[in-house]
Amino acid sequence: MIQPQTLEIRNGEKIPAIFSKEEMDNRFQAIRSLMEVQKLDGILFTSFHNINYFDHFLYTAFGRNYGLVVTRDRICSVTANIDGGQPWRRGVGENLIYTDWQRDNFFAAVQELLKGSQKVGVEYDHLSLQNLEKLKYVLPQTDFADISETVMQQRMIKSEEEIELIRNGAQVADIGGQACVEALAEGVPEYLIARHSTHTMVQEIAKRYPDSDLMDTW
């Protein structure tokens, strides 16, 4: 029996995004303008920051590859089966899961999404040389171009919604710092102080962003 290389798991419902649809549309409009200028048929993001920036899903690698494919008419994350349906629920776009049944199924999934592309943008500051060679193998007719610096410049210009998120993050950090001071006492172990501070911040994040995924709690 031949096991599948890719599959889809759409259990549950899409989770409300932290940023508005208008905010996300502006990001994709900017990235697709870049694609137009550089004559790219698609982009494969692989870094934590860009996948989170464009899809709202923050992955934990578990030794596996993750990606986000952006074309002129599609947004699709490529994730490991270990995450199940969470990337689809959290992400703003589609989701394609690769299985562990065969080696390098991640690249089979990328091939499925980008087959026929003449030019694809990738992140040279994150993509390993080994993985770049594997991409060239599954997409032999495709040229690859580095878009990491240009996309970084896009992320540096903060919107009002992003500034508001940064302010909230700073306020949460202040609350955590105050909790740390409150817990300080002679003979109290450092790990207890850190745990109290972290727990206080997690509670505050949950209050401010009730639909968020809290790291290390799922």
Predicted features along the sequence, with ranges:
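A composition/biophysics-driven feature that prefers long, compositionally simple stretches
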Residues: 1-176, 200
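Internal metal/ion-chelating core segments
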Residues: 154-218
